Amino acid sequence: MIPPSQFLDHIIRPVLSAFGVVQPRLHTRAAEQLMLGTALKESGLQDLVQRRCGPAVSMFQIEPATFDWVWRQVILERNPRLGAALGRFLFQGIAPADQLAGNQHLACGIARIRYWTVTEPLPAAGDVEGLARYWGAHYQTDSIPAQMREWVRLYEVHAEECFR
């Protein structure tokens, strides 16, 4: 497992900081907590490709259809300034879709923008159960209580100390 504090400091915070210049509500403490909890639950901060040969990739387990929708409809068509902020993290000469598994800055940005499209506001920072419910309702295809409990458990074991 990548140490959660390193993932937070070197992946999540730089991306959210760049986004925060364009749209301040994209970089909040609650957003940092949501993103770290999401990566912990989705991949255990270790799997770049989905277990059991599914299509999702990156520490945030983003499926190609989700990437395409966020990239084309949310970034390119409606938020070019946000696209420019995310562009700082792209590798030149490689199509963005082909970078998703290995470029965790890009994956973090796509995941955060995916959450941003939700009209319901983020729960408060420190509301771990609320963040887990938010993940279950807006990132997962099914809001399964056992999965949300596991999100909370992983967060409490691996991420809580990052925010003290």
Segments predicted by a language model, with ranges:
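Structured segments of extracytoplasmic/periplasmic soluble domains
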Residues: A18, V22, K41, R114-V118, ...
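Peptidoglycan-targeting cell-wall enzymes and recognition modules
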Residues: I2-P14, Q33, L40-T119
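Inter-helical turn/loop segments and adjacent helix faces that build the functional surface
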Residues: V118-G126
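Short, amphipathic alpha-helical segments
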Residues: A101-G109, A125-E129, P145
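Ser/Thr/Pro-rich, acidic low-complexity intrinsically disordered regulatory segments
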Residues: M1-P24, R133, A137, I144-P145, ...
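Short, polar loop/linker segments at the starts of domains and inter-domain junctions
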Residues: I75, Q147-Y155
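Secretory-pathway/luminal and periplasmic proteins that interact with or process carbohydrate-rich
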Residues: E42-Q50, Q140-R149
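Alpha-helical scaffolds flanking conserved acidic
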Residues: T28-G37, G126-Y134
